C-alpha cells in the first residue's frame, strides 16, 4: 500500500496558488527530484509544459530546484505530454517532467514525471522523492550547479515521430479534416502532422493565450468541432485535450466517436492486417457494445480500473498491446509508451485510407449501448451508502432485470462525496429509469 503524500495516480495536481501547486513547493520538488534522480547517473532532465499561463512560473521553479541539486534542465516549450515521453527516451535523459493539468481548466496545473524509458515514474521513485522533500534544501558546490538550455527542434522531432507511425504507402490527400487542439499543447503539432501527410486541414482551438486551454474546445467539449465539421462539409473532425494524451473524433454527420469506438477501429484493423497481438483492455466504464463487438471478432477483452495508469498495468499483465478509456486515452504499445492522441488518431486515419471507408462506416460494426450516469452527493462521514441494504436491494433488482444485456456500476468519487451511478443497457428509457431508481435509493440513505 502506498503512503505517498503528494503524488496521485497521475502525478501532482491542484489549483495554482494553493498547496501544493505553489512556487516554493515546486522549487523544493525540483530539488528533491534532482537529488533522487542524480543517483541514477544522467544529469539532465527534460521539462515541458502545456499552454497554461502558470507554466512559465512553475518551469522556472522546477529548473531552480534541479540546478541546486546539480541537474541540468532541457526546456521544450509547450509540447504534448506523449512528446515528452518520446523525447526523454531519445535524449537518454534521466527523466522527463510535464507541467500540465491535462483536460482541467487553466487555473489548475500539475506535475508528472516520466522515466528514462518513457513510462510513468515507478511508485518507489515517487516515494523516494517525497522522502527527500522532508529534508532541508542544500545546494551543491557552485562548480556542480545545473544549467538550463532549450531543445530548439523538439517540435520537429516529435512531428517526424508521429508521421513515422503512419504507413508510408498511404496518404491523407483525399481527406478534409477539422482539427481542434483545445488551445493546448498540440496547437503547433497536430495541424502540421496532418498537413505533411497530405490532408486538407482546418484548424480550430489553435490560438492559446494562457487562459483559454480546454475552454469550450477540445476533447472534453466537441460541440464547436461538431458544428465546424458540418459547416465545412468535412470528412471528419479530430479533437485533443489540453496536453494531447486524449483524442475524440467526429464523423462527417457530426456524431461523436469516443475512445471505445477508436479502440474498436484500431483493434479490428490490427486483426485484419495480422498485427494484433492478444486482446484489448478497456475500463469499468467502457461501453458494453465494445465488449460485444470485440467478442464477435474473436478479440479478447479485459476491464481495468478507471485511469490510464491502470489500463497500462492490465496491458502489461496480459502482454497485450492495445488499451483505451472511453474518455479518449488510447495506448498503443507497438507505437509508443503512453497514451498519445495524435498517434491514435493517425491509426484511425490509416484505416480510413486503406479501406476507403468513412469514419462513420468504420464505426458501424459496433453498436453503442445507452449509458446513463447520475451523480449523487452524500454527507461525508455518514457512512458508505453503497453498503446500505436498501441500495444493495435495488441494485440487485436492476441487475436481475438487465440480465446479460446490461450492466450496473456504482463508484465513489475519489475527490468529493459523490456516488456515481452508471446503468447501461439496450433500451435508453429503461436504463434511465433504472439509474434514477438506484440514485433515489442512495439519496434516501
Swiss-Prot record:
Q: Which InterPro entries match?
A: A-D-PHexomutase_a/b/a-I, A-D-PHexomutase_a/b/a-I/II/III, A-D-PHexomutase_a/b/a-II, A-D-PHexomutase_a/b/a-III, A-D-PHexomutase_C, A-D-PHexomutase_C_sf, A-D-PHexomutase_CS, Alpha-D-phosphohexomutase_SF
User: What terms describe the molecular function in GO for this protein?
Assistant: magnesium ion binding; phosphoglucosamine mutase activity; phosphomannomutase activity
Keywords from the named record: Isomerase, Magnesium, Metal-binding, Phosphoprotein
Q: Which domain of life is it from?
A: Bacteria
Instruction: Please list the residues that make up the active site.
Output: 102
Catalytic function, reaction form: alpha-D-glucosamine 1-phosphate = D-glucosamine 6-phosphate
BP GO terms, sorted: carbohydrate metabolic process; peptidoglycan biosynthetic process; UDP-N-acetylglucosamine biosynthetic process
Kindly list the positions annotated as binding Mg(2+): 102, 241, 243, 245
Sequence positions bearing Phosphoserine: 102
Q: Which EC main class describes this enzyme?
A: isomerase
Q: Does the keyword Isomerase apply?
A: yes
**E.C. number:** 5.4.2.10
Gene3D superfamilies found in the cross-reference section: Alpha-D-Glucose-1,6-Bisphosphate, subunit A, domain 3, Alpha-D-phosphohexomutase, C-terminal domain
Cofactor comment text: Binds 1 Mg(2+) ion per subunit.
PTM annotation, UniProt: Activated by phosphorylation.
- Show the coiled coil region(s): none
* Any one GO cellular component localisation term in the record: cytosol
The answer to keyword Magnesium applying to this record is yes
Q: Name one Pfam family in it.
A: PGM_PMM_III
In the record, the note on similarity to other proteins reads: Belongs to the phosphohexose mutase family.
Q: What does this protein do?
A: Catalyzes the conversion of glucosamine-6-phosphate to glucosamine-1-phosphate.
Protein's recorded name: Phosphoglucosamine mutase
Q: Which gene encodes it?
A: glmM
Amino acid at each position: 500500500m502506498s503512503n505517498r503524500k503528494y503524488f496521485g495516480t497521475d502525478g501532482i495536481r491542484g489549483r495554482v496558488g494553493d498547496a501544493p501547486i505553489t512556487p516554493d513547493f515546486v522549487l523544493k520538488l525540483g530539488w528533491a527530484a534532482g537529488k533522487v534522480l542524480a543517483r541514477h547517473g544522467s544529469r539532465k532532465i527534460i521539462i515541458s509544459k502545456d499552454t497554461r499561463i502558470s507554466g512559465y512560473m512553475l518551469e522556472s521553479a522546477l529548473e531552480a530546484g534541479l540546478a541546486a541539486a546539480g541537474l541540468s534542465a532541457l526546456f521544450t516549450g509547450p509540447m504534448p505530454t506523449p512528446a515528452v515521453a518520446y523525447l526523454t527516451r531519445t535524449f537518454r535523459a534521466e527523466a522527463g517532467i510535464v507541467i500540465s493539468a491535462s483536460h482541467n481548466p487553466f487555473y489548475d496545473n500539475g506535475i508528472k514525471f516520466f522515466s528514462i524509458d518513457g513510462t510513468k515514474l515507478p511508485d518507489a521513485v515517487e516515494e523516494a522523492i517525497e522522502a527527500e522533500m522532508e529534508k532541508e534544501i542544500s545546494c551543491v558546490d557552485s562548480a556542480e550547479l545545473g544549467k538550463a538550455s532549450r531543445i530548439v527542434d523538439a517540435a520537429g522531432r516529435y512531428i517526424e515521430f508521429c508521421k513515422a507511425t503512419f504507413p508510408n504507402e498511404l496518404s491523407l490527400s483525399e481527406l478534409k479534416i477539422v482539427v481542434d487542439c483545445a488551445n493546448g499543447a498540440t496547437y503547433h503539432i497536430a495541424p502540421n502532422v496532418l498537413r505533411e501527410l497530405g490532408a486538407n486541414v482546418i484548424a480550430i482551438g489553435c490560438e492559446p493565450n494562457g487562459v483559454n486551454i480546454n475552454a469550450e474546445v477540445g476533447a472534453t467539449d466537441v460541440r464547436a468541432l461538431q458544428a465546424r465539421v458540418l459547416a465545412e462539409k468535412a470528412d471528419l473532425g479530430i479533437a485533443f485535450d489540453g496536453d494531447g494524451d486524449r483524442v475524440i473524433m467526429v464523423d462527417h454527420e457530426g456524431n461523436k466517436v469516443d475512445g471505445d469506438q477508436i479502440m474498436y477501429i484500431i483493434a479490428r484493423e490490427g486483426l485484419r492486417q495480422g498485427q494484433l497481438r492478444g486482446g484489448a483492455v478497456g475500463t469499468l466504464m467502457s461501453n458494453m457494445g465494445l465488449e460485444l463487438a470485440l467478442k464477435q471478432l474473436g478479440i479478447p477483452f479485459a476491464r481495468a480500473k478507471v485511469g490510464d495508469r491502470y489500463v497500462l498495468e492490465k496491458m502489461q499483465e496480459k502482454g497485450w498491446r492495445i488499451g483505451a478509456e472511453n474518455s479518449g486515452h488510447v495506448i498503443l504499445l507497438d507505437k509508443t509508451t503512453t497514451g498519445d492522441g495524435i498517434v491514435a488518431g493517425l491509426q484511425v486515419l490509416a484505416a480510413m485510407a486503406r479501406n476507403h471507408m468513412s469514419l462513420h462506416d468504420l464505426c458501424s460494426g459496433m453498436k453503442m449501448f445507452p449509458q446513463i450516469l447520475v451523480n449523487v452527493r452524500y454527507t461525508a462521514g455518514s457512512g458508505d451508502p453503497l453498503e446500505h441494504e436498501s441500495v444493495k436491494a435495488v441494485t440487485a433488482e436492476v441487475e436481475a432485470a438487465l440480465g446479460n444485456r446490461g450492466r450496473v456500476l456504482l463508484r465513489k468519487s475519489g475527490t468529493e462525496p459523490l456516488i456515481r451511478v452508471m446503468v447501461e443497457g439496450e433500451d435508453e428509457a429503461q436504463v434511465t429509469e433504472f439509474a434514477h431508481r438506484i440514485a433515489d435509493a442512495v439519496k434516501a440513505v
